[in-house]
Swiss-Prot record:
Transmembrane segments: none annotated. Homodimer. CDD domains: RNR_PFL_like_DUF711. Belongs to the UPF0210 family. It holds the Pfam family DUF711. Gene3D superfamilies: 3.20.70.20. HAMAP family: UPF0210 (MF_01221). This is UPF0210 protein llmg_1581. It comes from Lactococcus lactis subsp. cremoris (strain MG1363).
Length: 445
């Protein structure tokens, strides 16, 4: 093996904030379905504990052996709206409590899958789950929720969009963490390892391991060595760096899969930032030559970064999947926070950036007086970008405080500056309900 490659890998880990962001075990709950909600809850608890009981231990073991920090060990489950629909219950909070109890028992920080897939309409379980979401998330610490409101094949369920705007507004009256644990998707993927949007798709194996990597600091350091060079060299440098990052993710996933005796799923090629200095996607874009993220050229820089990461990573992994792109969460990226505070970055520019990356308007604080219809309209805009461009888009917004204030989350969630929102009304638009039809180019058969 090339000694230079070994040195570069050591530097990635020791100096450039490289880590494995998450090992996520996906668990099918289809065999937990029961007409009695209490029996269903107990089956859910038992299956999660039995399947993922050693997940944290194995993750720590692998991290210690390889000398790599594995930040999170997590679990995703089959969308609970499907599981709960077999019961006569009108509230699925007991199932969320079972998930939370299992998460605490096995020592993971988050469990995803309190979810509903409603891109083309509601089944009984979907409506019950969405109505119970504020109560379920308030009653639990580690449960994450998601709702898929649109897809390229189905269009956008605008009734669900309206309902999610109202749900987010209701939850904003509670703890700030409630909306940080809820993602509204279009074109949601079934093998996403990242929270809060992870759920285990019904087309997946009974139990799988998916891995999410993190490496903005590594990419930035590599780009520092090619300052002033052409975009051709820039793209090639990102590709080579992404290959190394993904290769480690592949190794960790294989080791976890073998030791847990679980099928290996995918490596998610996403670049996921943290609030730490030197671990920012925004700073990578600035290293390309932008004075600050948010200025003209930001969308082009992000498009190239996203594409080059995929091209480099896809050769390094057996199977890639998940969201696989650069994440641009505002509160979780110190460069994004700085750009918002300086006035260089606004919601409209972030929306443009979501056209070319993963995932969407992520961890953004907006004024608490923002009406539910405006929140729903923001979701509709993001869903439209995803549906028309055949990609995953999402919204995770926190209505809290006044414009200019800072909402402190701490840890990996960082600080969210409260951003300006257009005050003109979208209420009549959102009140229509119904379905925006699928785009013409969705008809592929």
């Amino acid at each position: 093996m090339d000694i230079q490659n070994i040195k570069e890998t050591i530097a990635m880990i020791e100096e450039q904030n490289f880590d494995i962001r998450t090992i996520t075990m996906g668990i099918s709950l289809l065999d937990c379905i029961d007409a009695d909600i209490d029996k269903t809850a107990e089956k859910i608890y038992q299956k999660i504990v039995n399947k993922a009981g050693k997940l944290v231990e194995v993750g720590n073991e692998i991290g210690h052996e390889l000398g790599i920090k594995i930040v999170n060990k997590r679990v995703s489950v089959t969308p609970i709206a499907i599981i709960g629909a077999a019961t006569a219950a009108d509230d699925y909070t007991p199932l969320a409590l079972a998930m939370d109890r299992a998460a605490k028992e096995i020592g993971i920080d988050f469990i995803g899958g309190y979810s509903a897939l409603v891109q083309k309409g509601y089944q009984k379980g979907d409506e019950i789950l969405i109505k119970s979401m504020p109560k379920a998330l308030a009653a639990t610490e580690r449960v994450c929720a998601s709702v898929n409101v649109g897809s390229t094949k189905s269009g956008i369920n605008m009734t669900a969009v309206r309902d999610m705007g109202e749900t987010i507004k209701i939850m904003s009256k509670g703890d700030k963490w409630l909306n940080a644990k809820l993602v509204v998707f279009a074109n949601a993927v079934e093998d996403n390892p990242f929270m809060a949007g992870a759920f285990h798709g019904v087309g997946e194996a009974d139990t799988i391991i998916n891995v999410g990597v993190s490496g903005p600091g590594v990419v930035k350091r590599a780009l520092e060595k090619v300052r002033g060079e052409s975009f051709d060299i820039l793209a090639e440098t990102i590709k080579k760096t992404a290959f190394k990052i993904t290769r480690i993710g592949q190794l960790v996933g294989q080791m976890a899969s073998e030791r847990l005796n679980v099928e290996f799923g995918i490596v998610d090629l996403s670049l996921a930032p943290t609030p730490a200095i030197g671990d920012s996607v925004a700073r990578v874009l600035e290293e390309m030559g932008l004075e600050t993220v948010g200025t003209h050229g930001t969308t082009a820089a992000l498009a190239m970064l996203n594409d080059a990461v995929k091209k480099g990573g896809v050769m390094a992994a057996e199977r890639v999947g998940g969201l696989s792109g650069a994440f641009i969460p505002v509160s979780e990226d110190e460069g994004m926070i700085a750009a918002v505070n300086s006035g260089a970055l606004n919601i409209e520019k972030l929306e443009a950036m979501t056209c070319v990356c993963s995932v969407g308007l992520d961890m953004i604080a907006i004024p608490e007086e923002t009406p539910a219809s405006t929140i729903a309209a923001m979701i509709a805009d993001e869903a439209a970008i995803g549906v028309i461009n055949q990609k995953t888009t999402a919204v995770r917004i926190i209505p809290m405080g006044k414009e200019g204030e800072q909402i402190e989350f701490g840890g990996l969630f960082g600080v969210a500056p409260v951003m300006r929102v257009n005050k003109a009304s979208s209420a009549d638009f959102i009140a229509r309900g119904g379905q925006i039809p699928a785009p013409i180019h969705s008809f592929k058969n």
